[in-house]
Structures are given as structure tokens and as C-alpha cells.
A protein has these predicted regions:
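Alpha-helical scaffolding within the catalytic cores
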Residues: 19, 138-139
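Beta-strand elements of modular eukaryotic interaction domains
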Residues: 23, 59-61, 115, 143-144
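Von Willebrand factor type A / integrin I
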Residues: 117, 141-177
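Von Willebrand factor
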Residues: 1-127, 131-135, 150, 154-162, ...
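Conserved ATPase-coupling elements of RecA-like P-loop NTPase cores
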Residues: 45-47, 135-138
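Catalytic-core regions built around general acid/base machinery
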Residues: 52-59, 139-148
Length: 177
């Protein structure tokens, strides 16, 4: 399912707030990460990514030349990362081998992984249906500090109370269902 106009507008505003945090982005080539929760149906994930990239590119010159780290969140034990051109993501070629995986996931492990391996990214987008859980609230809050929480934008279909409690720093945009 594609993002609506209101969600795209909120996303652009969230991106602007993240990039204008003092000390975050100072110009030049932007390095960003896009986490795709593989519990999303392939068609929905592809449409959402294409819509997001189109909106970002039309929004600002900053997104014309980007180092895009794509993180495929398949399960707690399987988090794959690859660097892909935004044009390839916009065309949808990385989704040719996409497999939907419905498993119980904990955001704790994803946040730990992002803190370790995506610390250089100035913007992190998480696309998910929001069906993940929080195993350890303390670990999540620790992973979000000092910078990760200020760089994350969560694009979710639904938000549970435990996920909402994490949003002290990370911004959440609920998609139309």
C-alpha cells in the first residue's frame, strides 16, 4: 500500500527536523539508511519505497546524491545490509528476490544492530507494519542514545503502547490502513 499525501508530507517534515538537528548533516553527500521489515508484503514494500524515494528526491537537492544503506530486517537473527543506489530502489530491482517473512521480532535487536553498524547514517527510515515487540525497554532506550533516536523516522501501519513509549526521541508516522 502506497503512502498517502498526508503521510508523505509528515515524512518530509520529519526528515527536515532530523537533518536540521545541530551537528547532524552539514552538507555534501548524505548517508542514510532504510530499514525494510520483511513482514511487509512484497508489493506494499516496493510501492512504499518507490513513493518515499520519489518524494524525497522531489523535496530537496540533498537527495539527488545519496549513499543508501538498505537493511533487510528478516528476523532477529537475520538482518542483512547492502548499499544500493536510490535509482535501483526506485525501479524496484532489489525486490525481485524479496521474501515476506512473518516472524515475531523484537526491535531491541534491530536497534542494537543499527547503533553498531549504521551510526554514520544521518537519517534512518524504518518501514514496518509495526507488528514487532519490545523485549527490553532499557536496552532500547540505551540503543537510542545518544544519536540514534534523533536520526530515526518510523513509518508504521500500527503502533502499540510499548512502541509508542520509545518515541521519546524517534518520530513515528502512522500510515493509512
Amino acid at each position: 500500500m502506497e503512502l498517502g499525501m498526508i503521510q508523505l508530507l509528515k515524512m518530509k517534515q520529519g526528515v527536515e527536523r532530523i537533518l536540521h538537528v545541530p551537528g547532524n548533516y552539514k552538507g555534501g553527500i548524505l548517508e542514510m539508511a532504510m530499514v525494510i521489515d520483511c513482514s511487509l508484503p512484497a508489493g506494499d514494500a516496493k510501492e512504499q519505497v518507490q513513493g518515499i524515494i520519489k518524494a524525497l528526491k522531489s523535496h530537496s537537492e540533498t537527495f539527488r546524491n545519496v549513499r543508501l544503506n538498505v537493511i533487510w530486517w528478516k528476523s532477529d537473527s537475520e538482518i542483512a545490509t547492502e548499499v544500493l543506489p536510490m535509482a535501483a530502489m526506485q525501479l524496484g530491482t532489489p525486490f525481485e528476490g524479496y521474501e515476506q517473512k512473518q516472524e515475531e521480532k523484537y526491535i531491541d535487536r534491530l536497534l542494537e544492530n543499527l547503533k553498531l553498524f549504521q551510526a554514520r547514517s544521518k537519517l534512518i527510515l524504518l518501514l514496518s507494519p509495526g507488528d514487532f515487540s519490545v523485549q527490553d525497554q532499557g536496552k532500547c532506550m540505551e540503543s537510542l542514545k545518544p544519536f540514534l533516536g534523533r536520526k530515526m523516522l518510523l513509518l508504521l501501519d500500527q503502533v502499540s503502547e510499548e512502541i509508542e513509549s520509545l518515541s521519546l526521541k524517534a518520530r513515528i508516522i502512522i500510515q493509512e490502513v
